[in-house]
Amino acid sequence: SEDERPVGIQIYGRDLDAMVEAAKIVEEARPDVIDLNFGCPVKKVAGKGAGAGMLRNIPLMLEITREVVKAVKIPVTVKTRLGWDCNNIIITELAEQLQDCGIQALTIHGRTRSQMYTGEADWTLIGEVKNNPRIHIPIIGNGDIKTPEQAREAFNRYGVDAVMVGRATFGCPWIFKEMKEYIFRMENTCIKDGAEQQSSSLSSLPSPLSTFSPLTLDDKIDILEEQLRINVERIDEYRGILHTRRHLASSPIFKGIPDFRQTRIAMLRAETVADLTAILEECRVRLKPDKQ
């Protein structure tokens, strides 16, 4: 819906003509941006030369980027990684090359393809790209952003224009609201104290302080149930549940449930909306403190 904009659609591939055609098809859906995925590290993608596999074929990556930019009228962005492995860290030069291709923003995950999701994301290199005087497009940092505090540090320490949150959203779709509220609250405090620390990338956004209220446990379970309903309505019950149940089973709000392992297994095996909803309602009861 229009309320959910801006909306981006991400595509990946290694065939030039197919990528251009895919971008044209995607443009018909009227997204606000088309993102080219040159960062997915999984074997079934990168092993075939797509996603992060493009980091081993920079000329083709740049050609695809240039041609997609020329083929569509909406903004094109790119997401990629630092390089293929620790011996091939190329992001500083690559960022300039991609910018020259005409992209409107660049998202950098702070690991190489070989690292997959192991170790820690190297935000120092992301910061170096952002602070490169030759870079004028927005730089979006990605990797290990799990808390509001980490998100704010990324803005203040590395100067990025935005942060992208990935795995931390599993079972926690409210994380964006919590991060946004925390950042604005802290920046507002700094301003009141006379500190000139407000990030320019945040100053133009409307403040949520007047409308934000902390989410209760009931609120969060309601949101998870809504997420389940929306996914089923937009796809179908079978695939909607497949997409949703692993997110629900990963939710951090259930860590307070004793012996949650069996409940988690039940979530991952649930096949109907009714089954999953019943499990969530059981969790709601089990998480509430005993009444004296």
Descriptions of predicted regions:
Residues 1-32:
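Glycine-rich, positively charged N-terminal anion/phosphate-binding segment
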Residues 5-16, 75-85, 140-141:
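Conserved strand-turn element in the central/C-terminal portion of the radical SAM core barrel
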Residues 11, 53, 57, 79, ...:
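Glycine- and other small-residue-rich loops at beta-strand/loop junctions that grip anionic moieties
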Residues 16, 42, 52-54, 86, ...:
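Short, flexible micro-motifs
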Residues 20-50, 59-137:
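Alpha/beta enzyme core
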Residues 71-73, 87-105, 117, 124, ...:
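Alpha/beta catalytic cores of nucleotide-metabolism and tRNA/nucleoside-modifying enzymes
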